[in-house]
């Protein structure tokens, strides 16, 4: 019998988590909270408009830890990081809410969103419509659907729930088969290509470059993971990829927003440093 991969263990835990949470707060209660939440901020639209101008559309991630790296950031204040990102030029935020594997929390999303005016995606492992409604109740503007964690029927069901509650969907793929499934099953304009293999956690930017020709022009290709320096950003720009999801490179920096500027808006860095002085 093969040993479950990290992704398989996470998904198994998510089913347990949904059972535990729905025993505490019913779906009907959650739907009421979702209806009462602040209006969505337009996650997809913000990215599309920025990328249209061939400007970096950056989803800046707020992440304390990961299964592959352990704790990434010791000094972790989500609201503070969110403000830093907004000042640094982020288009959107991504907040990890997975507790067991990423040391995330629902409260981190709420704290980050309350501190800024940027749209926010709930970065978690969605396996049940309950989690989608929960995301809207927490104030999220978008949810992540990971193709490798879902079959086509479940993927379509989760996307339909997202639409019902007013959430955008970012679908995440890692290879050609997953991309084909995503394009066939979902009409979301946001297609994230994760350069990290979620089974092995190995990273290669070639993943984005290989899949790019197969992503229709009416969808927005977002490269995720492994963007660490200006050369990586420039490589993507040459290939007309202007949308990025970046976490670790920022989280390891003393000032995450300043690191965002260094990577994506270097002409702004001098100005910011002068202001800080």
From Swiss-Prot:
Catalytic activity: 1-(2-carboxyphenylamino)-1-deoxy-D-ribulose 5-phosphate + H(+) = (1S,2R)-1-C-(indol-3-yl)glycerol 3-phosphate + CO2 + H2O
GO MF annotations in UniProt: indole-3-glycerol-phosphate synthase activity; phosphoribosylanthranilate isomerase activity
Superkingdom in the source lineage: Bacteria
EC class name: lyase
Enzyme Commission identifier(s): 4.1.1.48
Biological process annotations from GO: L-tryptophan biosynthetic process
Family, as annotated: Belongs to the TrpC family.
Listed PANTHER family: INDOLE-3-GLYCEROL-PHOSPHATE SYNTHASE, TRYPTOPHAN BIOSYNTHESIS PROTEIN
Protein name in UniProt: Indole-3-glycerol phosphate synthase
Organism: Pseudomonas putida (strain ATCC 700007 / DSM 6899 / JCM 31910 / BCRC 17059 / LMG 24140 / F1)
């Amino acid at each position: 019998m093969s040993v479950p991969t990290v992704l398989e263990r996470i998904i198994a835990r998510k089913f347990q988590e949904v059972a535990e949470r729905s025993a505490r707060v019913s779906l009907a209660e959650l739907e009421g909270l979702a209806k009462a939440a602040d209006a969505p901020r337009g996650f997809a639209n913000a990215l599309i408009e920025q990328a249209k101008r061939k400007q970096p559309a950056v989803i800046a991630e707020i992440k304390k830890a990961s299964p592959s790296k352990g704790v990434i950031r010791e000094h972790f204040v989500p609201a503070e990081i969110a403000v830093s990102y907004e000042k640094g030029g982020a288009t959107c935020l991504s907040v990890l809410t997975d507790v067991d594997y990423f040391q995330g929390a629902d409260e981190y999303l709420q704290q980050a969103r309350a501190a800024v005016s940027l749209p926010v995606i709930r970065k978690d492992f969605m396996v049940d419509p309950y989690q989608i409604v929960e995301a809207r109740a927490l104030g999220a503007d978008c949810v992540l659907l990971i193709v490798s964690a879902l079959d086509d029927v479940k993927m379509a069901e989760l996307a339909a729930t997202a639409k019902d509650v007013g959430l955008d969907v970012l679908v995440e793929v890692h290879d050609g088969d997953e991309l084909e499934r995503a394009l066939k099953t979902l009409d979301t304009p946001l297609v994230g290509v994760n350069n990290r293999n979620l089974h092995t956690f190995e990273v290669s930017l070639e993943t984005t470059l290989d899949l790019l020709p197969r992503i229709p022009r009416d969808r927005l290709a977002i490269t995720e993971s492994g963007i660490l320096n200006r050369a990586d950003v420039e490589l993507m720009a040459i290939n007309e990829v202007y949308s990025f999801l970046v976490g670790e490179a920022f989280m390891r920096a003393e000032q995450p927003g300043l690191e965002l500027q260094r990577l994506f808006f270097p002409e702004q860095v001098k100005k910011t440093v002068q202001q800080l002085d």
